[in-house]
């Protein structure tokens, strides 16, 4: 027999399943009672009633008939589990009024409300039923993480125990209290950002740490997570930056300008902020992230492809609220904003060649260094002012160097070469 699979289920698979329509609909929720009318005039009782067992356990159950009708016997009775008739070799008559059942190596319940174990009369009518709960006790929840949106609330989520599935209805309660005083509180808004999460909407204190933990309970036991201690100011996140605008930078074919505003919900609070930008081309799903935006609210993306549509998003990390030393939590990304770079006016492969201007060398150390600098710049997107100041300084130095070379060669501003004068006389 395969490990972990119950004997009766494995054997009953050889028989065609009994239609669920033959059972009362309350059985689907494992709510059983005495049949009302029908051909089953006798009633019975199953013992034990509604047992709770660990996976791999065995069950010894009995169905005992009682009633006032003469001739009532256990002969012809049979069992079903979740609508499937169990093999007759799993049952035996104890006496004229009692049918016993032996199940071994039970698997986890197929529904958290319990499996349906039913005793039937010869004609198929229901005599008695029991809910069978088979599962595992909960394990200690872990990995609790919490965040506060704009310091107005607190949302937490966690991971259930190592195995996760207990096969039984398991209740998770998030508890919290002020660290040094106050009573335990229970979160009430569950499943807000997933199956294991809870939302505390209001009445939170600032500048005072909270203790937060999760308790898990089911029919087989309980478990409690480690305590998480946090200050709301240390876990603040905010809405994505609004009013993100992306535009061209004049006629520069490889650059786009991105501008946005600070989170309005935090405008009255003392905090720093850092931003991230990510962008992708229109026909790609791969994003490139720019990390060095610092606390600016504008950025120039460089090294882009000419004549290409780009989608851009921005997110914010409002760290350092009221002097908090924590790293902060990133917001969601803003809605994508699109813009295109200008088309290149330079000839492509096979086209004309751009000739150097008169007096400009077509090669040399300076031009090679500039080519290397621009090639490096095209591979990166920079948003810090320092990068563009360096680029502007590079251009100014190049212009000054070019002017110096022209003067050394005797080229006048008008482009005419000056005539060399000899000594007077």
UniProtKB/Swiss-Prot annotation:
Entry's free-text remark on domains: The WSXWS motif appears to be necessary for proper protein folding and thereby efficient intracellular transport and cell-surface receptor binding.
Signal peptide: 1-33
Ig-like C2-type domain location: 35-134
Motif (WSXWS motif): 330-334
Chain intervals with Low complexity compositional bias: 415-425
CDD domains: FN3
Pfam families in alphabetical order: EpoR_lig-bind (PF09067), fn3 (PF00041)
Gene Ontology terms, MF aspect: ciliary neurotrophic factor receptor binding; cytokine activity; cytokine binding
Region feature Disordered, mapped onto this chain: 335-366, 402-425
InterPro entries found in the cross-reference section: FN3_dom, FN3_sf, Growth/epo_recpt_lig-bind, Ig-like_dom_sf, Ig-like_fold, Type-I_Cytokine_Rcpt
Function as written in the Swiss-Prot or TrEMBL entry: In complex with CLCF1, forms a heterodimeric neurotropic cytokine that plays a crucial role during neuronal development. Plays a role in the initiation and/or maintenance of suckling in neonatal mice. May also play a regulatory role in the immune system.
Annotated localization: Secreted
GO CC list: CRLF-CLCF1 complex; extracellular space
Gene this protein is translated from: Crlf1
Summary of the tissues where the protein is detected: Widely expressed in the embryo. Not detected in the brain of adult mice.
Subunit structure: Forms covalent di- and tetramers. Forms a heteromeric complex with cardiotrophin-like cytokine CLCF1/CLC; the CRLF1-CLCF1 complex is a ligand for the ciliary neurotrophic factor receptor/CNTFR. The CRLF1-CLCF1 heterodimer, as well as tripartite signaling complex formed by CRLF1, CLCF1 and CNTFR bind SORL1 (via N-terminal ectodomain); within this complex, the interaction is mediated predominantly by the CRLF1 moiety.
UniProt record similarity statement: Belongs to the type I cytokine receptor family. Type 3 subfamily.
Disulphide linkage map: 146-156, 187-198
Name by which UniProt lists this protein: Cytokine receptor-like factor 1
Organism: Mus musculus
Chain positions found as Phosphoserine: 222
Alphabetically ordered keywords of this record: Disulfide bond, Glycoprotein, Immunoglobulin domain, Phosphoprotein, Receptor, Repeat, Secreted, Signal
SMART domains: FN3 (SM00060)
KW Repeat (keyword) present: yes
Carbohydrate-modified residues: 95, 107, 143, 171, 295, 385
A single BP term in Gene Ontology: ureteric bud development
């Amino acid at each position: 027999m395969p490990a972990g699979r119950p004997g009766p289920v494995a054997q009953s698979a050889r028989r065609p399943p009994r239609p669920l329509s033959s059972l009362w609909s309350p059985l689907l929720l494992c709510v059983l009672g005495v049949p009302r009318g029908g051909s089953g005039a006798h009633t019975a009782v199953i013992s034990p009633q509604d047992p709770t067992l660990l996976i791999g356990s065995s069950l010894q159950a009995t169905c005992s008939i009682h009633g006032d009708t003469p001739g009532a016997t256990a002969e012809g009775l049979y069992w079903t589990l979740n609508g499937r008739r169990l093999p007759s070799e799993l049952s035996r008559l104890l006496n004229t009024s009692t049918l016993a059942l032996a199940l071994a190596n039970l698997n986890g319940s197929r529904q958290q409300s319990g499996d349906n174990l039913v005793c039937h009369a010869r004609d198929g009518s229901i005599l008695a039923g029991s809910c069978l709960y088979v599962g595992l006790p909960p394990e200690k929840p872990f990995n609790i993480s919490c965040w506060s949106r704009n310091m107005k609330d607190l949302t937490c989520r966690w991971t259930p125990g190592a195995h996760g599935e207990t096969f039984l209805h398991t209740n998770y309660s998030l508890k919290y209290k002020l660290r040094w005083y106050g009573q335990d509180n229970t979160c009430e808004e569950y499943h807000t950002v997933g199956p294991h999460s809870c939302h505390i909407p209001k009445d939170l204190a600032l500048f005072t740490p909270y203790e937060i933990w999760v308790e898990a309970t089911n029919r087989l036991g309980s478990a409690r997570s480690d305590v998480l201690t946090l200050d709301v100011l240390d876990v603040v996140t905010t809405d994505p930056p609004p009013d993100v605008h992306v535009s061209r930078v004049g006629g520069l074919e490889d650059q786009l300008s991105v501008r946005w505003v600070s989170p309005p919900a935090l405008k009255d609070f003392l905090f720093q902020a850092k931003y991230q930008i990510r962008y992708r081309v229109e026909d790609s799903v791969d994003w490139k992230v720019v990390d060095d935006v610092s606390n600016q609210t504008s950025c120039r993306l460089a090294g882009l492809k000419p004549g290409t549509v780009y989608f851009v998003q921005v997110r914010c990390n409002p760290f350092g609220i009221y002097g908090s030393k924590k790293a902060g939590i990133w917001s969601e990304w803003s809605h994508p904003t699109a813009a295109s770079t200008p088309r290149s006016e330079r000839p492509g492969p096979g086209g004309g060649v751009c000739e150097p201007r008169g007096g400009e060398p077509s090669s040399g150390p300076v031009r090679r260094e500039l080519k290397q600098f621009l090639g490096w710049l095209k591979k990166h997107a920079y948003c810090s002012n320092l990068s563009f100041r360096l680029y502007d300084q590079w251009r100014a130095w190049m212009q000054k160097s070019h002017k110096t070379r022209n003067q050394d060669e005797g080229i006048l501003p008008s482009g005419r070469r000056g005539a060399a004068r000899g000594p007077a006389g």
